[in-house]
Amino acid sequence: MISSHQKTLTDKELALISGGKTHYPTNAWKSLWKGFWESLRYTDGF
């Protein structure tokens, strides 16, 4: 079951992944997201 908050976060993540508009265009957020995405890649073996 997905809450509205989780869906909103997912939409933002999709926007970041696709390189589209983002609600958090700050360098800090991009750095955090990059680190998070890298950790996902290593964990899931992408």
From Swiss-Prot:
Its main location: secreted. Transmembrane segments: none annotated. Residues 1-20 form a propeptide. It is found in: Secreted. The keyword Lipid biosynthesis does not apply. It comes from Lactobacillus acidophilus. GO terms for biological process: defense response to bacterium; killing of cells of another organism. This is Bacteriocin acidocin 8912. GO terms for cellular component: extracellular region. Keywords: Antibiotic, Antimicrobial, Bacteriocin, Plasmid, Secreted. InterPro entries: Bacteriocin_signal_seq. Has a bactericidal effect on sensitive cells but not a bacteriolytic effect.
